[in-house]
């Protein structure tokens, strides 16, 4: 199940774990990324908490935790090479995997059609 947030994160939910990243729209708005900071595995976050930071030549931005949960894995590849986020934001450049406190909570997020309407 693919879901989106109004803060321009995408989630691919499988078996109570969500793979989370930023959308193509967000990556395009940020420009070329030069730095990515990810949370530690085992960290817990509530929906809306700042979970990661990205820096581009334009600005620094927070990446928010889309739902309550625990970080179970991070994508070290984007820390080592932040440009991956620009080249494949909704694929290989995922940020972290989040074990959802309530897997049904993802049902309340935007579907792809609603997200496309949001970004026009």
Swiss-Prot record:
Keyword Coiled coil: no
InterPro entries documented for this protein: 2-oxoA_DH_lipoyl-BS, Biotin_lipoyl, GCV_H, GCV_H/Fam206, GCV_H_sub, Single_hybrid_motif
Swiss-Prot/TrEMBL GO biological process terms: glycine decarboxylation via glycine cleavage system
Pfam families: GCV_H
PROSITE patterns hit by this protein: BIOTINYL_LIPOYL, LIPOYL
GO cellular component, one term: cytoplasm
Cofactor binding summary note: Binds 1 lipoyl cofactor covalently.
Xref: Gene3D superfamilies: 2.40.50.100
Subunit structure: The glycine cleavage system is composed of four proteins: P, T, L and H.
HAMAP family, A to Z: GcvH (MF_00272)
Family: Belongs to the GcvH family.
NCBIfam families: gcvH, PRK01202.1
Record function comment: The glycine cleavage system catalyzes the degradation of glycine. The H protein shuttles the methylamine group of glycine from the P protein to the T protein.
Protein name, as recorded: Glycine cleavage system H protein
Biological source species: Sinorhizobium fredii (strain NBRC 101917 / NGR234)
Gene transcribed to yield this protein: gcvH
């Amino acid at each position: 199940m693919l879901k989106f947030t109004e803060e321009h994160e995408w989630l691919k939910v499988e078996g109570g774990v969500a793979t989370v990243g930023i959308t193509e729209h967000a990556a395009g708005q940020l420009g070329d990324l030069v730095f990515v900071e990810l949370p530690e595995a085992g960290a817990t976050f509530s929906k809306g908490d700042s979970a990661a930071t990205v820096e581009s030549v334009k600005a620094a931005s927070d990446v928010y935790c889309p739902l309550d949960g625990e970080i179970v894995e991070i994508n070290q590849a984007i820390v080592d090479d932040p440009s991956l986020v620009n080249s494949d934001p909704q694929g290989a450049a995922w940020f972290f995997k989040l074990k959802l406190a309530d897997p049904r909570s993802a049902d309340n997020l935007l579907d792809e059609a609603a997200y496309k309407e949001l970004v026009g």
